[in-house]
Regions:
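Small/aliphatic-rich secondary-structure junction motif
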Residues: 1-57, 156-219, 241, 266
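Structural beta-alpha unit
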Residues: 1-2, 41, 78-112, 213-244, ...
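Active-site phosphate/pyrophosphate- and oxyanion-stabilizing loops and adjacent acidic/basic residues
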Residues: 24, 77, 132, 175, ...
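Solvent-exposed polar/charged
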Residues: 25-28, 81, 105-106, 136, ...
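Residue-level recognition of beta-strand->loop/alpha-helix junctions
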Residues: 38, 91-93, 146, 189, ...
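A short acidic, glycine-rich active-site loop
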Residues: 55-71
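Hydrophobic alpha-helical segments and helix pairs
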Residues: 96-146
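Glycine-rich, Arg-bearing micro-motifs that act as flexible, cationic patches
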Residues: 115-133, 246-267, 276-277
């Protein structure tokens, strides 16, 4: 079976450890190729050449940057001692979000996994806002989680979507999880109108979506709520999903980015955000 190439951005916090524990959970069913990346947040005027030498225009002390680089590289080496020599570690300079996104796309990762402290994150850590920005901009699926889910038993995966215009989406990662865990796939649409009035139309669209995306073991759900975030939270309270998947495109409408970002910050469930076509 082909391995999943996974990137874990790390600030060496316990949240980054949660991300690794989640990846180890995935490894129980599918091979994984794990890469840790630490980005030292510095202006674009600070650069590092292929030999690791630091250059700067002068507004930042080179010695300070070198010192921080040495500390980070020691911590990355400690990750290998802790998790094994089969993991890969990387160090970059730059703006955290842009560096992570560029590195992930350049190296063709299948998944980015990030631990987050939600909206209460400490500024220097990979806070909820950092994870939000990466989920918003990334064309690679992002799995985010707020706590240790190493005990997770993956049986039910929820896909929250607007099924008004059924289309083929890039669900390769989600379909792989469904296959290796033999899970049930739940399709959910949240409406602000009357459920009974829309139920037949929505379920027909869900069936078309399932056919277009080769989904088999699935169930259809439609609920009424004031917005996507509350709808997902209330549905999960009633049905206890194990992983929640939600698409992003930033074009407005019911599935604009804010719904995903609010869920990343407030829902104590692993969330996979993926880019809609």
């Amino acid at each position: 079976m082909e391995s999943l190439k996974i990137l874990i951005p790390t600030d060496f916090s316990v949240q980054a450890e949660f991300a690794y524990l989640m990846v180890k959970k995935l490894e129980e069913r599918t091979p994984v190729d794990v890469h840790f990346l630490h980005v030292l947040n510095v202006p674009d005027t600070v650069t590092m050449d292929s030999k690791g030498e630091i250059q700067t225009c002068g507004e930042i002390d080179v010695k300070y940057v070198v010192q921080q680089k040495d500390i980070a590289e020691r911590k990355l080496e400690n990750l290998k001692l802790l998790y094994g020599q089969n993991i890969h570690t990387h160090f970059l300079l730059g703006k955290v979000t842009d560096a992570i996104l560029n590195f992930a796309e350049k190296n063709h990762y299948d998944l980015i996994v990030m631990g987050t402290k939600g909206s209460w994150g400490i500024r220097e850590k990979l806070s909820g806002s950092e994870t939000q920005m990466i989920a918003r901009k990334s064309r690679i699926p992002v799995l985010s989680l707020m706590c240790d889910r190493s005990d997770l038993n993956i049986q039910n995966i929820l896909l929250v979507h607007d099924f008004t215009h059924p289309a083929k989406e890039d669900l390769q990662l989600i379909q792989k999880l469904v296959k290796v865990y033999n899970t049930k796939f739940h399709l959910l649409q949240i409406t602000s109108g009357k459920v009974e009035a829309e139920k037949f139309r929505v379920e027909e669209n869900m069936k078309k979506f399932a056919a277009l995306n080769n989904l088999e073991n699935y169930a259809c759900h439609i609920i009424n709520d004031k917005d996507v975030e509350n709808g997902v939270i209330h549905f999960n309270q009633m049905n206890n999903m194990d992983i929640i998947c939600i698409g992003t495109h930033g074009k407005g409408g019911i599935f604009h980015n804010s719904a995903t970002e609010k869920l990343i910050n407030h829902l104590f469930k692993p969330i996979i955000s993926f880019h809609l076509n």
